[in-house]
Amino acid sequence: TYSQGIYDAFKAKMNELGVSYIEQTFDKENKRDFSTQVAALKDCDVIFLPIYYTEAGLIAKTCASKGCNAVLFGCDGLDGVASQIDSSVKNQIKYITPFDVNSKEEKVSKFVNSYKAKYNALPDQFAADAYDAVYAVFNAMKKTGVNNVKVDPTALGTAMAKAITASDFSYDGVTGKMTWEASGACNKV
């Protein structure tokens, strides 16, 4: 899963660097009460959260109520956490993401302004990823040369996979420039 892959890579890097850490697991059935985990991690400097923003918001609230001042660090899944928490703990949360809603890049500004006009809200990482996915697929579809609406779905899928993984195919979107490996794995710069 998304979270497990990030967790495994982070843990491997910590081991490689010789960084000491404490592991805590979260009950998949109980995603509302994180007091036991926060109590065990209270004296840590950083708590790594390879999760999505809903649970991260609950953990941030629990940290605030238990006097835990650790930096909560994660990836793009935390984009949106600000809407889940009180402003007093926002400075504790840090995450990396390929999308910056405040970017001055023309294509990003255009996307942000269009999104704001339509939804009366700022887009988050998930909206930007969806936008890029649609246009990457659209561009791959154009590259296939297939323009027959009645084309066989399997043939179309094969043609699109070939197009998107070709060495000359890339998509420069609002979250970065993307290329795809033969396996389908996406590389983003």
Please annotate each region the language model reported.
Residues 1-189:
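Extracytosolic ligand-binding ectodomains
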